[in-house]
Amino acid sequence: MKKVIIATLLFTMLHSCMGCSDSQSDMEPIPVPQEEYMASDMVIYEANPRIFAEENAFSAIKAELDRIQSLGTTVLWLMPVNEPGVLKSVNSPYCIKDYKKLNTRYGTKKDLKELVDAAHAKGMKVILDWVANHTSWDNAWVTEHPDWYTQDANGNVVQPQEQPWADVADLNFDNETMQQAMIDAMKYWVTEIGIDGYRCDYAEGVPDAFWKKAIAELRTLDNNLLMLAEGGKTSLMNNGFNLLYGWNFHSKLKDYYAGKCSLTDLYAMNTSELEGMPKGTLRLRYSTNHDQASEASPIECYGGERGAMSAFVLTTMLEGIPLIYSSQEVAYPRSLNFFNYGVIDLKSNEVFAQEMAEIIRAYKAKSSVRGGELEVYTTGDVASFYRAAGSHGMLVMVNTANESVQVKVPMEHAGKTMTDVIAGVDVELPTVMTMEPYQYFIYQQ
């Protein structure tokens, strides 16, 4: 319980990115809407099969399940496992040739079933990436059912018009027969392999009516399926999704670390992203994922390993469900193109991984204050955050700058005796303290 409270605060403090100053006076609380959100200890690990093994990735991931679980993972998300297309291909795993066949480089249906069963035995759920908006150009549907695709005035199948994706053909969701074939394929992996849900790629590109129909039918097979929408619009949640991307918060987080916005701006984005979310639904929060890592690693985005850790703390502890992207746990220093195969040693930085696991343990321990009153502070480069519920409270202070700073402890907490969760000792909080670069304190009462 104690670890929970402190961890949460710590993460919030980490919001403040390095180098950005805030115009608000020190210690002025920023209003945060007091709404109840679903309490959840969910932690999602996004596994890119192409960095686990050049061949037989399902077996390679299975061999890593203990390590993945040790990070605190409760949900294993496998990036697309389907057979990829070749015609006009750029080697993207999101270019699907056959929805009911697997990428043979990853393994067999038996291998996938063994991976899912092994994850279940360890108490983890498994969700698959699902690409509903488009297929590869050599998908059999293109020649057998051209009316299942969007066509131009001359009857030619076209790529998605709103995206520069020339390697894929745009599906026509006005065609009810195509919709049912898609739903049938989604049901296939639930019934044949026993998966626990889907992460739905480019969910905003697919009509709401399809998602409502598909999710309703899928839940006749398993009412507890987890459905994650890659999209930012709150309206997606009305279709049956449980989780929605925190895109805007992530963009603001990167801007903050780049010195392009203030801490106040970041707090405001956190608030605005949560407005209008239906009860029982949450945002997925992340400091990186496969798209972001293909552009720049967290090490490059947030000012080194310590900066990257602070960004992870922030996204994990403020609000929502945390995501870990495979390679993030070893502080991989360079961009990582998910179109390519290339094995990464995911045990190469165990100290960093262990710290991430500690943060996740703190996240899971925060149940005593989850849903409690949140107060955030602007204190220069130090993010400060306090959450209280009943007799429990958590204060986190995080120096997000790569330099030592002197910072005032929030006035209402100065002089209190609280437990330093990391050190395991009781301390009387001073009025002013010195914090080393990226240093953080987590206090519990």
Regions found by a protein language model. Name each.
Residues L14-Y37:
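Bacterial Sec-dependent N-terminal signal peptides
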Residues E28, V32, T191, D201-Y286, ...:
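Active-site-proximal helices and loops of the catalytic beta/alpha 8
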Residues I30-V75, M79-I193, K213-D222, L226:
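Substrate-binding/active-site clefts of carbohydrate-active enzymes
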Residues W77-S89, D129-D138, D201-P207, E230-T234, ...:
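Short, solvent-exposed turn/loop segments enriched in Gly/Ser/Thr/Pro and often Arg
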Residues F312-P333:
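Substrate-binding cleft of secreted/luminal carbohydrate-active enzymes
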Residues M397-A401:
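Asparagine-centered strand-capping/turn motif at beta-strand->loop junctions
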Residues L429-Q445:
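C-terminal beta-strand-rich structural cap/linker in extracellular carbohydrate-active enzymes
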